[in-house]
Amino acid sequence: MSNKGQLLQEPFLNTLRREHVPVSIYLVNGIKLQGQIESFDQYVVLLRNTVTQMVFKHAISTIVPGRAVHFSTAEPADANSNNG
């Protein structure tokens, strides 16, 4: 995975994990999983509901938080935003 992707994924997933935000995870095959993110690494997300499921990131289409979340990448503004 590119470094740019990790700059967004890690703070987003960490916020969801730390704040115990309920999430819906949609897989590429259309299946919807629900629970709370327990942990994650470069390749998988551990999703806890009645049991803990290991979900491979390559199978994930979308992660939808159950409420609004605010997170920071702690990086300066994107260079592309200075196109004016």
UniProtKB/Swiss-Prot annotation:
Disulfide bonds: none annotated. GO terms for cellular component: cytosol. GO terms for biological process: regulation of DNA-templated transcription; regulation of RNA stability; regulation of translation, ncRNA-mediated. PANTHER family: RNA-BINDING PROTEIN HFQ. InterPro entries: Hfq (IPR005001), LSM_dom_sf (IPR010920), Sm (IPR047575). It comes from the Bacteria. GO terms for molecular function: RNA binding. It comes from Verminephrobacter eiseniae (strain EF01-2). This is RNA-binding protein Hfq. RNA chaperone that binds small regulatory RNA (sRNAs) and mRNAs to facilitate mRNA translational regulation in response to envelope stress, environmental stress and changes in metabolite concentrations. Also binds with high specificity to tRNAs. Belongs to the Hfq family. Residues 10-69 form the Sm domain. Homohexamer. Pfam families: Hfq (PF17209). Keywords: RNA-binding, Stress response.
